[in-house]
Every structure is written in structure tokens, then in C-alpha cells.
Amino acid sequence: MHGHSRNGQAHVPRRKRRNRFVKKNGQCNVYFANLSNKSQRYMADIFTTCVDTRWRYMLMIFSAAFLVSWLFFGLLFWCIAFFHGDLEASPGVPAAGGPAAGGGGAAPVAPKPCIMHVNGFLGAFLFSVETQTTIGYGFRCVTEECPLAVIAVVVQSIVGCVIDSFMIGTIMAKMARPKKRAQTLLFSHHAVISVRDGKLCLMWRVGNLRKSHIVEAHVRAQLIKPYMTQEGEYLPLDQRDLNVGYDIGLDRIFLVSPIIIVHEIDEDSPLYGMGKEELESEDFEIVVILEGMVEATAMTTQARSSYLASEILWGHRFEPVVFEEKSHYKVDYSRFHKTYEVAGTPCCSARELQESKITVLPAPPPPPSAFCYENELALMSQEEEEMEEEAAAAAAVAAGLGLEAGSKEEAGIIRMLEFGSHLDLERMQASLPLDNISYRRESAI
């Protein structure tokens, strides 16, 4: 049921806004469900799992790994000391060969322990920590009495080295991930559609907040919208490429200062039949991707963002952000997201704009080049000179024929001479009634 506003007009409920496929910060809004053997697959690639996990979870995992290893080997050392009988000896018993406790007699010889000064589980745990971390206080140590204790010390040292190397490698890989470099790559909040070089174009702006370059930087864009095939198959996330200059190399950019990426809306564009009104009612999302290698690590990074139909401003352009100073160029990032409206931007689609240009305003023929124009002038002047020479020669012939001035034939000859046609002059000479005297004179000559 439609609601009513305060002024009495009916209020039409707006259509539910579609969920983003890619968020503005570049994260993909996708949740994986019902994965079979997910834990086994993730544990099979434990290194990538640790690198992809959050810092707090990774620190918890390694802290638990160290604690478990210390407890395990501490329990192992305690068991060795327990079964060897080291825990039953009194701490005050003198060592073998020591002075007597009293009476001047020989002191009883105490059995040599496997681990010196380990009288309980706490002592065994401390010895385990000292062994794995190579602290080496020197108070507790293993004797040659128990080979099993020696083997346990060797195994714990190897396990400690493995855990340390794995932890250091994972932390370094996580810190050097190019994903964090994408945090300093910036996309404009809005995309715009306006006329550039006589054609409607979709434009958005990208920038690099660091002075270090992105090597081999290039951009891509895809339009994502629901699509129904001719067979009735529904595709909720159909992807269409938006050409940003792949064929002529405009997709490769030198990202030192902010650059406006341009998609020309032509016949191959999914936006070709979309005008301003259709844009306001369409349900689509444009995903923009910037890829390149980090200059410091040579690792590939990717920054992503997206624009919904409501985030595309029709008839707007971006404000300039690069200004030339005395000795350098200044980039004002306070203007990075700002746009201004362009008056006179057509509200029709690119198809309608192209058809109107063809039917109403045909393109004028291309002007001749300067070289052709000069040749044409030279040819015209040469033809005029030839016409003047032919006219002079015809006048001399007419004077030799002895025509009477003012006669009709002479007037016709003069007109033909002025016209400059040699063939007409010959036909006129053949039709003139020449007298016998003149003819004989010509023949005699």
C-alpha cells in the first residue's frame, strides 16, 4: 500500500538498493557457505592460511604453538626425571664425593640425576623453556646419565628452530604483503558522465598517495548487473568489460599525479543505450581495478573500488588538481573528489546522440590540404594562361581572314574566342563563307 506525504501527494516506495559486490574499500562482499573439507583444505596450505589471517589470530596461533611445545617437552623431562628417581632425592643431599654430613664418616653417594636441579614439574618446565629459547642460565643441565634426556633436548632444539623460522617467515611475508600498498591508492568517491571530444564518456579518477611509483600500472573496469539469457537462465552477477583503451594502450598509466580514466561510450559499451533517466533507474555496479608492481618489493598489488548507478553523476566533470608552480607541479588532494556540473550536457543516450548527429548534423567533408590547394591554384593559373594564348592566336587568324567588323560571323567568332574553345573555333572556320580571293591567297601561301 502506498503511503502519503504531508502535502497529500502519493509516495511511491523506492526499490531496494542492491548489495555491493565490491565495497568501496576494495573488499569483496562474498560469503562462502557449505564448503566440504574446508578445514583440511586450509590446513594443507597452512602458510597461506597464516598469512591471510588477522594479526591477532596469527599471534595467538604462534603463542599457543610455543606454549604447547614448552609444556610438552617440560612434561617429557619431568617423566624422565620421575622414572629415573630424580624427584625422590632430597635437595640437601651432597654430591658424590662430598664431605660428610656429620660424624666424620663417608657421606652416602647420591645417584646422579638425568637433569640437574629438576625436582618437580615446574623445574622441568623451566628447563624446557631454557632449552628451546637457548637462554642457557647454566643452573639446570642434562647429564650423560640418561641418553633419552639427551635425545629429547636435541629434538626440542630442532622443533624450536622450525617454529621460530616459520613464525619469522610468516610475519615478514605478512608485513611485506602488497595488499597494504593498496591502502595508499585512491579512487574518487563518484564517477561522472560528460562529453569529451564530442562523445559521451564515463570517467573516474585514481591517485597515488606515495612518492614511490607503481610499476607497470594498468586499469580495468567491469560492469556487473543481473542478466536474463534468451533461454531464460538468470545470471545474478553477469560481468561485462568496459573498454578503457586496451587496444591503443591507454589502460597503461604513469601514476605520478592523479589521472582521470576514460571509458568512451560507443557501440560496444554496455552503457551505449543508457541515458540520464535510464541511469537513475538501472541496477548495476561498475567495479574498477588498478594493478601494478610495488617499486620497493616488485610484488604485484591490486586496488579495487566500485560505483553504483546512484554514484555516477551525469553531466559533471572533475575539478583540476594539478597546478604548475615555479619549479614543480603541485597536486591539491583537497579537490580530488570534487566535481562541477557542465551546462549543456545532453541527457540522451550515446546511441541517440550518435543518431542525431548522423540525421540532423551531417559531418562536413574534410577540407583540402594545403598541398592540394596550392596545386589547384597553380593548375588554374596555367589554364588561364593557355586560354589567353589561344584567344590571341585565334584573333590573329581572324584578322588574316579579313572578316568585316561588326558582322554577325565576326561577333560569333569573337564570342567563341573569348570562350577559349579551339574545337569550336575550327567548326566555325569550316562554316564561314570564305571568298575566292582570300582562299587563293591562303592556298598560295
UniProtKB/Swiss-Prot annotation:
The keyword DNA damage does not apply. Residues 1-55, 171-445 are cytoplasmic. Residues 81-120, 140-148 are extracellular. A motif (PDZ-binding) lies at residues 443-445. It is a multi-pass membrane protein. The chain crosses the membrane at residues 56-80, 149-170. Pfam families: IRK (PF01007), IRK_C (PF17655). Residues 91-111 are annotated as: Val/Gly/Ala/Pro stretch. It comes from the Eukaryota. InterPro entries: Ig_E-set, IRK_C, K_chnl_inward-rec_Kir, K_chnl_inward-rec_Kir2.3, K_chnl_inward-rec_Kir_cyto, Kir_TM. Keywords: Cell membrane, Cytoplasmic vesicle, Ion channel, Ion transport, Membrane, Postsynaptic cell membrane, Potassium, Potassium transport, Synapse, Transmembrane, Transmembrane helix, Transport, Voltage-gated channel. One of its GO terms (biological process) is potassium ion transport. Residues 121-132, 133-139 dip into the membrane without crossing it. Inward rectifier potassium channels are characterized by a greater tendency to allow potassium to flow into the cell rather than out of it. Their voltage dependence is regulated by the concentration of extracellular potassium; as external potassium is raised, the voltage range of the channel opening shifts to more positive voltages. The inward rectification is mainly due to the blockage of outward current by internal magnesium. Can be blocked by extracellular barium and cesium. This is Inward rectifier potassium channel 4.
